[in-house]
């Protein structure tokens, strides 16, 4: 079950998340 946890963390650690375009745009600004 550690793989699942790593996957979740990686998804949240992604610099540019497709689910959060606003966040990505704000970071790019």
Curated annotation (Swiss-Prot):
Record-listed E.C. numbers: 1.12.1.2
* Chief place where the protein resides: cytoplasm
**UniProt region (Disordered), positions on chain:** 1-29
Note on how the cofactor is bound: Binds 2 [4Fe-4S] clusters.
Cofactors (names):
[4Fe-4S] cluster; [3Fe-4S] cluster; [2Fe-2S] cluster; FMN
Query: Molecular function terms in GO for this entry?
Result: 2 iron, 2 sulfur cluster binding; 3 iron, 4 sulfur cluster binding; 4 iron, 4 sulfur cluster binding; hydrogen dehydrogenase activity; metal ion binding
Task: Quote the cellular component terms of the Gene Ontology held in the record.
Answer: cytoplasm
| Listed Basic and acidic residues bias regions | 1-11
**What keywords appear on the UniProt entry?**
2Fe-2S, 3Fe-4S, 4Fe-4S, Cytoplasm, Iron, Iron-sulfur, Metal-binding, NAD, Oxidoreductase, Plasmid
Give the reactions, separated by semicolons, that this protein catalyses.
H2 + NAD(+) = NADH + H(+)
Where does it localize? Answer: Cytoplasm
User: How does this polypeptide assemble, per the annotation?
Assistant: Tetramer of an alpha and a gamma subunits (flavin-containing dimer), and a delta and a nickel-containing beta subunits (hydrogenase dimer).
What family is this protein classified in? Belongs to the [NiFe]/[NiFeSe] hydrogenase small subunit family.
Q: What is this protein called?
A: NAD-reducing hydrogenase HoxS subunit delta
Provenance organism: Rhodococcus opacus
Q: What is the lineage of its organism?
A: Bacteria, Bacillati, Actinomycetota, Actinomycetes, Mycobacteriales
Whichever gene encodes this chain, its name is hoxY
């Amino acid at each position: 079950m550690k793989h699942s946890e790593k996957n979740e963390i990686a998804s949240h650690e992604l610099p540019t998340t497709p689910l959060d375009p606003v966040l990505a745009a704000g970071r790019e600004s």
